Regions:
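Short, low-complexity intrinsically disordered segments enriched in A/P/G/S/L with frequent Arg
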Residues: 8-10
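Alpha-helical segments with a strong preference for the paired helices of cellulosomal dockerin domains
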Residues: 43-77
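Bacterial N-terminal signal peptides that target proteins for export
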Residues: 17-28
Length: 475
């Protein structure tokens, strides 16, 4: 018997109560295949009897899914084309000056969209170089074609010298079951580079039970730095803006686990956190001493749950010349991070020419149009061009576990869809309930500038992004 290049997924995953049953069934099916000396073909049907039994583990898993009563998701018969014309949600003005930055977006329980941004008023600088930064939201009831009036999420008071002076860089998630909203943000007057344990960049937590109409406010600075009490070098941190990832597999108590990343100082890199109570408390994934991107130094990052329940990290580098993303994987079976990989090849990597910038990471279920095969697609948004231009979405197919069981799997194999021709920077995206991609990014648009950004929204189909190679599966 020989293998077809796929590895047995013998991993314990605390999120899957059927994992041991599936492992036993894998063994039984494989043993039967050997005893019968039959070939398990690429389509999962038995071929002619031969003396060399070739076993495709993906097809074994399909048999097991049938035994356990799992049903494969059914794709829409034809994914409709979408109106991809960008819509300005937050409009930066240069005369008089009024700046918006840092996109975040969630889908509410009833299907409406809530977009968020920093209102930086008359300065485009970050917390520490600016005062009175607010986080605003706008709601769309028609899939992003139009947006309502601004609503206040976190109100910065420029006269304050403490926590309430400024709030920005929102990281957001809507709970899948309850609809509760969570925003984690940077707060206060101290900048990231000047933060100390005695006078740190502060951390805010905002929660809403009514679709963002009202918000409860809590300062959680001591709690967040307290995670790293054993690590005094962690003297500055903030949550990476954009999407907080919610697990589809791990549920503890009332909530599915959420993951996010805080950016630590030079020499520390990014630090991945998780919460099992929807942001009330956080822990470091892999422990407080884990450093998944120590060299080159990790910066703002995003995480996404892989189809097997492990956690994929995609990170911006503090070293601009890296020209790409840094990837790593947390493996629940080994309870450890892997060996970081760099994806910076201009042809097959997540290349970003001399540009260090935040972006978004997403993995969605799709159908490959060439053969109707159900699989997953990794999406990574980032500027492609030099000096923050040409925001694009890179995409990479994930057919089975051999495509995502090592960080190096994400170094190559990416293709690209270009979203804009303009100078453009931070971006985020979520998969909506209908399988489309709600994309929200910073774009110089009509501002005749290389760094004054409007925040633009557009709906994109998987079919559009991949030039028809894949179509979405409704989630």
């Amino acid at each position: 018997m020989h293998w077809t290049g796929r590895r047995m997924p013998f991993r314990y995953n605390e999120s899957d109560n059927l994992s041991m049953i599936k492992i036993c069934l894998q063994s039984v099916v494989l043993l039967l295949a050997v005893m019968l000396s039959q070939d398990v073909g690429a389509q999962g049907v038995y071929g002619d009897v031969n003396n060399d039994c070739e076993v495709d583990i993906a097809d074994v898993n399909e048999v097991i899914n049938v035994i356990l009563g799992y049903t494969a998701p059914v794709p829409p018969p034809d994914e409709p084309e979408l109106d991809t014309i960008p819509v300005t949600v937050f409009d930066t003005e240069l005369s008089p000056r009024h700046y918006y930055r840092i996109p975040a977006i969630v889908q509410l329980h009833d299907g409406r969209l809530l977009a968020m941004a920093d209102d930086r008023h008359n300065s485009d600088t970050d917390i520490g170089g600016n005062r009175g930064i607010d986080i605003l939201g706008k709601v769309s009831t028609d899939g992003g074609k139009t947006w309502g009036e601004p609503l206040m999420i976190a109100n910065g008071a420029s006269f304050s010298n403490g926590f309430n002076n400024s709030h920005g860089d929102a990281a957001a998630v809507a709970d899948r079951e309850t609809g509760r909203l969570l925003v984690m943000c940077a707060s206060g007057t101290q900048g990231f580079l000047s933060s100390t344990l005695q006078n740190p960049l502060r951390v805010g937590r905002y929660m809403s039970e009514d679709d963002g109409q009202t918000w409860s406010e809590n300062e959680v600075t001591s709690e967040m730095y307290g995670i790293f009490t054993e690590c005094p070098e962690v003297n500055s941190l903030f949550f990476s803006s954009g999407r907080i990832c919610q697990s589809r597999r791990i549920k503890v108590g009332d909530y599915y686990r959420i993951y996010s990343v805080v950016d630590g100082p030079m020499g520390v890199g990014c630090l991945v956190l998780y919460s099992d109570d929807f942001g009330l408390t956080w822990q470091a994934l892999g422990g407080p001493h884990a450093r998944p991107t120590i060299t080159p130094f990790g910066d703002e990052a995003k995480v996404e749950e892989l189809p097997d329940g492990n956690v994929l990290l995609s990170c911006r580098s503090k070293q601009t010349g890296t020209s790409g993303r840094l990837f790593n994987i947390y493996n629940y079976f080994t309870a450890s991070w892997g060996e970081m990989a760099i994806s910076n090849d201009p042809e097959g990597g997540t290349y970003s020419e001399d540009c260090s910038c935040n972006g978004e990471l997403l993995i969605v279920p799709v159908v490959r149009t060439s053969d109707g095969r159900n699989m997953h697609l990794a999406l990574q948004s980032v500027p492609r061009g030099k000096g923050r231009q040409l925001v694009s979405i890179y995409y990479k197919p994930l057919l089975d576990e051999s495509d995502y069981d090592e960080p190096s799997d994400f170094s190559m194999g990416w293709q690209r869809y270009q979203v804009t021709d303009n100078y453009s920077a931070y971006s985020t995206m979520i998969a909506t309930a209908d399988g489309h991609i709600a994309f929200f990014h910073e774009d110089c648009n009509d501002n005749n500038s290389t760094s004054a950004y409007d925040l633009l929204f557009q709906q994109l189909s998987i079919k559009k992004i991949t030039n028809g190679r894949y179509t979405a599966i409704k989630q």
